Amino acid sequence: MPVDPFVHLHVHTEYSMLDGAAKVGALFAEAQRLEMPAVGMTDHGNMFGADEFYQQAKKTGIKPIIGIEAYLAPGSRFHKKPVFWGEAKQRGTDEYGEGGDVSGAGAYTHMTMLARNATGLRNLFTLSSRASMEGQYRKPRMDRELVAEYAEGIIATTGCPSGEVQTRLRLRQFDEAMQAASDYKDIFGAENFFLELMDHGLPIERSVREGLLKIAKELGLKPVATNDSHYVTADQAESHGALLCVQSGKTLNDESRFKFDGDGYYLKSAAEMREYWDKEVPGAADNTLLIAERVESYEDVWSFQDRMPRVTDGSGKTERQLLEAEVEQYLPTRYPEGATQECLDRIKVELDVLDTKGYCAYFLVVGDLTRWAKSQGIHVGPGRGSAAGSLLAYILHITNLDPLEHGLIFERFLNPERDSPPDIDLDFDDRRRDEVLQYAIDKYGRDKVAQVITFGKIKTKAAIKDSARVHHGQPGFAIADKISKALPPPIAAKDIPLSGIVDPQHERYAEAAEVRNLIETDPSVSQIFDTARGLEGLIRNAGVHACAVILSSQPLMGTVPLWARDDGSIITGWDYPSCEAIGLLKMDFLGLSNLTILGDALKMVKANHDREIDLSNLGLDDAKTYELLARGESLGVFQLEGGGMRELLKRMQPTEFADIVACNALYRPGPMEVNAHNDYADRKNGKKPVEPIHPDLDEPLKDILSETYGLIVYQEQIMAIAQKVAGYSLGRADILRRAMGKKKKEVLDQEFEGFQAGMREQGFRDEAIDKLWATVLPFAGYAFNKSHAAGYALVAYWTAYLKANYPAEYMAALLTSNGDNKDKMAVYLAECRRMGVKVLSPDVNDSLNDFTAVGSDIRFGLSAVRNVGSNVVASIAKVREDKGRYSSFTDFLDKSETVACNKRVIESLIKAGAFDSLGHTRMSLAQHHEAAVDAVIGLKRQQALGQFDLFGGGDDAGGEESSSPLAHLQFTPDEWPRKQMLSYEREMLGLYVSAHPLDGAERLLAPYQDTGIAELVGGEREAGKDQVKIAGMISGIQRRINKNGHPWAIVTLEDLDASVEVLFFPKSYEMFADCLVEDTAIAVKGRINEREGTISIFASDAVPVDISAAETDPGTSPAFVIKVPASRVDRSLVAELKRTLQAHSGTVPVHVKLQGPRGVTRLALSSDYFVSTENGLQGELKGLLGAGCFETVL
């Protein structure tokens, strides 16, 4: 017998974060299976899921009923204190197992609200947004005043047992419950307000039912049956319980954990719902159909409208006319000698396209933002993405590359055949990005500008970890780690989904055999895995997109849901694709750290050299810059610092800007797979001939391919080829380019027909056509956007220019930018040593907050010292400026403000060496600083009361220092042993600065290593090599016990340049535990392990290394052997090698091994070329000859 339908109106999806476990797609799939005509969505306090819910409904044909389970303040939404309605004895937990008074500890009640039409949905957007902005107190709360203002188009119910009416009934306040229901009846209308009934087997639900039905009868209201659905199917109850434990931090066996009492919190079938409700409360289930029938289409909410901000000057000019006026205004700033006809023609073409597409306002807005930022001294990137191909963007100072000069194509950015909107990403100094955002808010309206939401999801490994914790608590992490390590390695930073592990149809199923074996043999793993599958992919939290900003011509309130963060920033409740789909303008305001580095470096250049460098007008022909790149010394240079990239630069020997652009485009997996990067380098340097694709195409394609030596490197080249030989428009050519990139055979076959016909019309033979198509097709899959490559190449050139010409200033800025990354700091400090730039310890007289260039040296910033906050640094610098440099330690204490006279701060500064220049040893100051600070603080307090002068009181302030209570302190010349001093320095700075315990020990460690740690962690190891030998000093040991009771250890091993973790598992730990002593040198052999971009070593062998000879007898050095491929030997290399050796003159003999096809020839150099292996020799040799170019022979 057919069952009447039922519509679920109280449904929580995963957007009820860490409370709802129903994925929207799965929810609709189940609703389809159950043949439901409609389904509702009522997430807790937000409408973030409305767009996904609506789109899924359209796909399935199920009617969407979009709503919210709202939080209502018990009084005013502006009142942010608990409110209780009952007697004190009714609070806490009542006989039904829930709080007997207002929920949320007196903060809110609940109400279910459903949008009846588009107006109602917009009103729900507004209500939820204002609740977040104005009513946030534990939850985002509305109040009756707000609900009454926006009640139009909304159907409401009394909600769950925590609703206002139910709460009053629980408190035995029937009159108040009746009054509340009457008030809401008046607000929404009798036909739009229902009494909501639930039953999950809880006494609290049934205890209020009689009162609700009585109120319904007396007020003429209808009851409606709902199920408080939080997951899709009954078998997901356990996963939902685990999700609640993730939210609360509890475990499943914790009796105090938050859990759902009762059962049935899933999408029940119509039969299940009607079987109960048709008997208990006839008509309650039918009313779900009544509500569903009354809900109208929301289509208008999702209709696309041009919501781009409008621009006017009040004169009545069109936006095109305003744009033309700006072009005319700024054209002379770009072409002071006058624009060419080519330039003027292109301006018109671009203006016409923008006007036709309706994007003139967009360019006016973007131009305004970038020019304002530049006027405020905020460094702006030269352009990224295809926007750099626009001449108008260049003229308006949006970008900084002349597309005519660099061969960049506007049609790659926008063309008449292209439907997608233009997208100009803006890079700003990352410390000042927020200023640009605030300007946009001030200019275009706080109600029309918002940042964009993102959703953090529970990914594969996090799901495993969460599941392990909720089942086993802290000990579960060991099991989670075991499972995670058994997973196949991630591809493109994505792990195999848990479903793929057990799905034979999944493409990576075969790789997951180890995980399946664990699941089959270990019940704990099986349990964790099953729960993790239920957690994986659910939304964990909401965040803010790193760069996306929405701008609108109309208020965003009511257009999309909004969310107010604790800091007051307004965020869209939908992600940016959803916002763009309804016509909102999305822009990217990116914070680029390299622009901050450039800005800091330029300030120091101005201060130290009195030179104002305007990067926008910097020539691209600086010889020192290209020489630096050709030597591969690009560590710290934007986009060019990786080990492989440095090798490519040395092979390429760049001589012009186009080479840097090509490097950016070629050093990627696609081109490298076909060796295009090396082909470019070899063709450029004459090692390989430049061959035409086909003889018939040599002349036609010469202008297009000559800059890349006959190779197709850029997407723009594919477009230009189609235009030149097939007669395509550039817009049509862009469609061809995109089709080629997608590689769909049926599409490609169709495109080839048009391409072939076009070439035949141009007179080309089929042989040439087929050869060109066969050549272009694979290249199209990885050809790069030249505009983007050129924009980033310009930033790369700027950073390389400063490193080559102002090394101290640039490296100081680079160190400041990476102050929070100790691994990178170590690498860059090593690079400073290689460059001959000395990094000086922090100093209370010379240091500022950040690293600063002092002559040709760099001074450490005081903010890098542990326990020294920015307020202390500011105080030290201000006092120094107001009262003069500190002449002694006591002078420092005398002059300093109380904030800097703190024992912990002073001790940290002493250990970091910040007082070294004042004449006392660190050890002596450490012995006396506490007594000195006590004396000074006491006197400063008295002085603040007008009682004493620090050094003697009264008018005798200039008297003898012997009258000072500090005069009795006896500072001795004793100093800590070097090892201890360096240990303290590292403790305070995170790094060794004044010296390194391994200084002079390179020659002693060299026989035990085949690679340096910096090369290892920087990815410069040989391809396919998984075994490595390294040597260094142990700077940290974490000793652990595994679940079987066996000890193991994680050892931090560092050399002069970098550090890496070495794992000694139980077997190797047992063999080598005696070698594992902090601050001792050790050599390790092991297997390279790389997970999520982090390198570690699994040790298989270890041996202690005696480096005492580094200090006691440097004259007994073994020979230092330099390996040189014979094929590379020429006069310039020999001259550079001589210069390098003589620059590091010392006592270590040098041998040269010439490696040729017929064997190795060893040459012993004369004593004129003996070296010191300290202070950067090895780094310079690597820069000249490549990694692995030296060894030591005893």
Curated annotation (Swiss-Prot):
Q: Which Pfam families match?
A: DNA_pol3_alpha (PF07733), DNA_pol3_finger (PF17657), HHH_6 (PF14579), PHP (PF02811), tRNA_anti-codon (PF01336)
Q: Which InterPro entries match?
A: DNA_pol3_alpha_NTPase_dom, DNA_pol3_alpha_thumb_dom, DNA_pol3_finger, DnaE2/DnaE/PolC, DNAPol_HHH, NA-bd_OB_tRNA, PHP_dom, Pol/His_phosphatase_N
Instruction: Provide the GO MF annotations for this entry.
Output: 3'-5' exonuclease activity; DNA-directed DNA polymerase activity; nucleic acid binding
The main location is cytoplasm
Q: Can you state the subunit structure given in the record?
A: DNA polymerase III contains a core (composed of alpha, epsilon and theta chains) that associates with a tau subunit. This core dimerizes to form the PolIII' complex. PolIII' associates with the gamma complex (composed of gamma, delta, delta', psi and chi chains) and with the beta chain to form the complete DNA polymerase III complex.
Which GO terms fall under biological process for this protein? DNA replication
Location in the cell reads: Cytoplasm
Question: Which reaction is this enzyme known to catalyze?
Answer: DNA(n) + a 2'-deoxyribonucleoside 5'-triphosphate = DNA(n+1) + diphosphate
Q: Which residues bind DNA?
A: 1028-1102
Q: What does this protein do?
A: DNA polymerase III is a complex, multichain enzyme responsible for most of the replicative synthesis in bacteria. This DNA polymerase also exhibits 3' to 5' exonuclease activity. The alpha chain is the DNA polymerase.
- The EC code for this enzyme is 2.7.7.7
Q: What is this protein called?
A: DNA polymerase III subunit alpha
* Family (UniProt): Belongs to the DNA polymerase type-C family. DnaE subfamily.
Task: Give the gene symbol.
Answer: dnaE
Q: What SUPFAM superfamilies has UniProt attached to this entry?
A: PHP domain-like
Q: Name one GO cellular component term.
A: cytoplasm
Report keywords, A-Z.
Answer: Cytoplasm, DNA replication, DNA-directed DNA polymerase, Nucleotidyltransferase, Transferase
